[in-house]
């Protein structure tokens, strides 16, 4: 946990800034300038909604917002934790906005979204960790845009996990995402406020409560992890029956965040993706610019089709 009065996105003083690595050509993206980008930004401002696209300085924001895709970040824009990789502000959060669920549904309707991703900051200050707000958002979306599929990306609800997962699963999201973020060895420095095996248990709990909810998890590469450690994370996810794995390049948001140890090549990402598919994931996204919600709608459609094909084969064998 960071100091409650510090903001994690505040730059370090000039003299304290270490040299930053130059990004390779495959990691560079165009600056966002399109009409669609500005329309999406304007709508989010009008509805007083936060997006992880902006708060986490996502490199894909130009592409996604041009297509009017956005990941809404609920429960405010201040996190109660201070992970070494994350650009979201940390400190004492504000009161939860009661209009957030309705405004999220309005945004989804105005943007004509077929698939929406909802995430949040950590809210260790709330009795339920913020689970109730996830439920309200899902319910508002079901009322206002019943044909929109819903993907949620939640924190670990430390100390409140079981009740939180049960409440959210009862609300019926289509995809439940919770990121492991990195390999277990790096948790003390990269994700000190969380526990690797607690996050795995959360993913298991989702499947235990409702096996038909797709589960998804992701890790960042380039933080100093070893190849075999990544393979082990894949195995751990499959043991928890995770359907979809995402793997992307870690990018240092500011000089005070964890440094990039390695820029993993596109070829290496392809190799990790092939290994993940061989391990039985229904869906795999593995590339330098892959992020949790990047192409989420298309990926969901492919994952659903893959499960339907798998179930059809199982029925054929059972009848055979």
From Swiss-Prot:
The keyword Nuclease does not apply. Its cofactor is [4Fe-4S] cluster. It is found in: Cytoplasm. Keywords: 4Fe-4S, Cytoplasm, Iron, Iron-sulfur, Metal-binding, S-adenosyl-L-methionine, Transferase. InterPro entries: Aldolase_TIM, Elp3/MiaA/NifB-like_rSAM, LIAS_N, Lipoyl_synth, rSAM. Residues 14-24 have a biased composition (Basic and acidic residues). It catalyses: [[Fe-S] cluster scaffold protein carrying a second [4Fe-4S](2+) cluster] + N(6)-octanoyl-L-lysyl-[protein] + 2 oxidized [2Fe-2S]-[ferredoxin] + 2 S-adenosyl-L-methionine + 4 H(+) = [[Fe-S] cluster scaffold protein] + N(6)-[(R)-dihydrolipoyl]-L-lysyl-[protein] + 4 Fe(3+) + 2 hydrogen sulfide + 2 5'-deoxyadenosine + 2 L-methionine + 2 reduced [2Fe-2S]-[ferredoxin]. GO terms for molecular function: 4 iron, 4 sulfur cluster binding; lipoate synthase activity; metal ion binding. One of its GO terms (cellular component) is cytoplasm. Gene3D superfamilies: Aldolase class I (3.20.20.70). [4Fe-4S] cluster 2 binds at residues 79, 83, 86. Pathway: Protein modification; protein lipoylation via endogenous pathway; protein N(6)-(lipoyl)lysine from octanoyl-[acyl-carrier-protein]: step 2/2. Its EC number is 2.8.1.8. It is an enzyme of class 2 (transferase). Belongs to the radical SAM superfamily. Lipoyl synthase family. This is Lipoyl synthase. It comes from Erythrobacter litoralis (strain HTCC2594).
